Regions:
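A short core secondary-structure module
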Residues: 143-144, 148-194, 206
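Internal helix-loop-helix
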Residues: 44-115, 156-162, 293, 297-309, ...
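A structural signal for short hydrophobic beta-strand segments in well-ordered beta-sheet cores
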Residues: 136-139
Length: 400
């Protein structure tokens, strides 16, 4: 794959979407089954991991080849691919960059091919933006780590076989220096998953209870007690994915559950239906949104700091939802818990976006966290004072 010219790669990608994929998905029902079929076909045709080393199933492609992929796949990726967003977009690049050789050979190819679904066990009831205050505990017992604690806002936990887990392994170290990153098997007795019902009526998120769950001793990413660095690396991959996803969309991609901003093309359709396509104010807002779409696309092509992309994309999502709210018919603003988010949506599609877009500014780090990150790490501004930065975690006051 890496030896193909950009134009030959473009032809191959178009053929895959035009000819191969429709035949692969024909007759397959269900989000997970269709998602697995899509990922397997993508991997088997050498397109799932263009920027990964060949020994892990990748193509070692150039940045220009990756841009060809972004251009040709925009709006054509099946909605079922969201099942693999955490695994392919976050867990796999973190393991690729920081995992041991054993972990790379065990997890990269199956994850990229869609044979295994991943979730991310980060946030806790008392540890969201201040993630380093987490209290889930991991203790070594022979050849296994024993993990006890609670996680929350976990996307896709009910459907996952594996998880990236952050747990505290040294309570006497300062809070950032006593954390370890693990790969946790989800399908075991010590893991309980409970769905959280959102105001949209669906349950994308879960809370996860860990009661003496077991992790093999060597399933550590990075160093023991050195998990903060890979944790930040994974968050950067998450923000990169959030900041650069395709926004041109097609009708088939409408039901990506509000994860992408409403494309301008769909807002134009809505304006036409509302009889306001020639409204001067609406035209001005749509022009702004079109500019925003292009900015997000170019940010992805340039590979800028992940926080910049995420800030732009979530801003675009809120602005698009506001325009939709001003245009939608009464039925378009309604959303019922019994509506099926897995199907193509019409009027109710806009209602879901309007309800869901604010949450996209929170996931992966709030807008305020992104601005702090940019100020400190990109602009070199002074860090916010942290009175607990060098205090042993066991000495910090915590809620009972």
């Amino acid at each position: 794959m890496s030896q193909l010219s950009d134009e030959d790669l473009r032809v191959q990608i178009r053929r895959f979407f035009d000819e191969v994929l429709p035949a692969v998905l024909e007759g397959i029902e269900g989000t997970t089954a269709r998602g697995k079929a899509w990922r397997a076909a993508l991997f088997d045709h050498g397109l799932a991991a263009l920027d990964y080393p060949a020994e892990y199933g990748g193509g070692g492609a150039s940045p220009s080849a990756l841009q060809v992929w972004r251009d040709e796949s925009r709006g054509r990726i099946p909605r079922e691919d969201t099942v693999f967003g955490i695994g392919v977009g976050m867990a796999m690049p973190t393991i690729r960059d920081l995992g041991s050789e054993e972990l790379k050979r065990r997890f990269l190819a199956p994850g990229l091919r869609g044979d295994e679904i991943w979730c991310q066990l980060y946030s806790e009831p008392g540890s969201g933006s201040d993630l380093a205050s987490l209290t889930t505990r991991a203790e070594l017992d022979g050849d296994e780590w024993v993990v006890t604690g609670q996680k929350v806002w976990t996307s896709g936990a009910h459907n996952s076989q594996l998880a990236i887990l952050l747990a505290r392994t040294d309570w006497d170290a300062p809070k950032h220096r006593g954390i370890t990153m693990f790969v946790l098997p989800m399908e075991q007795q010590g893991v309980e998953v409970r769905p959280l019902i959102q105001m949209t009526g669906v349950s994308e998120f879960n809370e996860v209870f860990l009661t003496e769950a077991r992790v093999p001793r060597d399933w550590v990413i990075g160093e023991v007690n050195g998990g903060w660095a890979p944790a930040v690396s994974l968050l950067a991959h998450e923000r990169q994915a959030t900041g650069t996803k395709s926004m041109s969309g097609t009708t088939a991609s409408r039901s990506k559950a509000g994860r992408s901003p409403i494309p301008v093309a769909q807002l134009l359709e809505l304006a036409e239906r509302a009889g306001r396509r020639d409204d001067a104010v609406i035209r001005q807002e749509l022009a702004r949104l079109h500019s925003g779409e292009q900015i997000v696309k170019w940010l992805g092509a340039r590979g800028v700091h992940p926080s910049i992309g995420k800030l732009w994309r979530t801003k675009q999502g809120r602005a698009a939802a506001d325009v939709a709210a001003s245009l939608a018919f009464a039925g378009g603003l309604a959303w019922g818990a019994d509506l099926d988010v897995e199907r193509n949506l019409d009027d109710d599609y806009f209602g879901y976006h309007i309800l869901n877009c604010r949450g996209m500014s929170l996931g992966g780090g709030t807008d305020e966290i992104q601005r702090n990150t940019l100020g400190e790490r990109a602009l070199g501004l002074p860090r916010e004072p942290g009175v607990d930065r060098n205090t042993p975690f066991s000495d910090l006051p915590r809620n009972a």
